[in-house]
């Protein structure tokens, strides 16, 4: 498993660059390779609309990849690139659904919480099924099942209008001075392997620069406070993000839950480290055990004694949609 940054808003050639890196990593990929694909890149502003995005991404992948190519279409199953235009609504941003479908094959009742670099998915699983009628990003934003919060790319000004610093709350500048990656770099929770996006100012991610960016959010510089004060500020931002996600989760569980007894919380994404504190803030989740997508759903990379290989399980956790489509396609190819 591997992932590469793909700033698709800069043009379709970014797909080619990412695929070249994949080919270098796995040079044996050839005409006998089967490719199971899900996407979310159709939303970028390089495309006039999402339909165009799905079709152009599908076309480019079909041109570049050798071997069989199939697109995950959720309830429609597997779709050939030639049919992408006709089925674009099912293909668009269906990555969350693949992860949820795969998780539901293992945990019949529960909740998938996938906190990634940019977004958070909150999906109820009931009776071995994905318990939501929502399919599009718009529908999931309306229901609260999609929260546009992640642990890498989210601007800090999107988390809160004010934040505690040296006592009373301080109003926050509505500027793209810093992102959540700075926060979780400061707290030590963000794995450097998953810190793939440029910083807000395109400068270093070292200790000083990482503090300078959040400092700007409250009108200061890194030199204006001590290390423990900047760590306290990072923790305040962290708490603000947890509260925002918890508010959506509380509303969603009150109105959309089809589970009558305690279920299992399945964690996924590079921000899975937030889930224990998040769950603790939602009364409806009291007593629900936490399980990892990488270890308990993907179940890949087991060692001889049956235990999960920690490194590969971590990557499966972060790359959950990719692992999910590969697993689902292996179980039920078209």
Q: Model segments located where?
A:
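Nucleotide/phosphate-binding catalytic cleft detector across ATP-hydrolyzing
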Residues: 2-113, 123-334
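Glycine-rich anion/phosphate-binding loop at the beta-strand->alpha-helix junction
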Residues: 118-122
């Amino acid at each position: 498993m591997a992932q590469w940054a793909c700033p698709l808003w800069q043009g379709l050639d970014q797909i080619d660059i990412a695929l070249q890196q994949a080919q270098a990593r796995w040079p044996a990929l050839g005409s006998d390779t089967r490719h199971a694909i899900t996407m979310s890149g159709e939303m970028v502003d390089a495309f006039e609309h999402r339909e165009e995005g799905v079709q152009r991404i599908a076309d480019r992948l079909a041109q570049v990849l050798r071997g069989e190519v199939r697109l995950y279409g959720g309830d429609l199953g597997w779709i050939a690139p030639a049919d992408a235009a006709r089925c674009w609504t099912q293909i668009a941003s269906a990555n969350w659904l693949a992860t949820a479908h795969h998780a539901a094959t293992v945990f019949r009742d529960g909740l998938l919480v996938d906190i990634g670099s940019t977004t958070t998915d909150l999906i109820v699983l009931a009776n071995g099924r994905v318990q939501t009628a929502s399919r599009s990003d718009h529908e999931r934003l309306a229901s609260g099942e999609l929260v546009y919060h992640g642990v890498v790319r989210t601007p800090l000004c999107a988390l809160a209008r004010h934040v505690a610093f040296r006592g009373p709350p301080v109003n926050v500048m509505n500027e793209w001075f810093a992102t959540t990656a700075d926060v979780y770099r400061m707290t030590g929770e963000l794995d450097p392997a998953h810190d793939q996006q440029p910083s807000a100012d395109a400068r270093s991610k070292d200790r000083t620069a990482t503090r300078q960016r959040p400092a700007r959010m409250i009108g200061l510089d890194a030199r204006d406070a001590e290390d423990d004060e900047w760590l306290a500020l990072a923790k305040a931002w962290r708490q603000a993000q947890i509260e925002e996600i918890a508010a959506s989760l509380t509303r969603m569980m009150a109105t959309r839950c089809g589970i009558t007894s305690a279920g299992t919380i399945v964690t996924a994404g590079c921000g899975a480290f937030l889930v224990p504190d998040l769950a603790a803030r939602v009364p409806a989740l009291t007593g629900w055990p936490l399980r990892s997508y990488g270890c308990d759903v993907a179940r890949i990379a087991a060692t001889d004694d049956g235990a999960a290989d920690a490194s590969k399980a971590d990557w499966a956790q972060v790359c959950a949609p990719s692992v999910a489509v590969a697993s689902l396609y292996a179980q039920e190819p078209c």
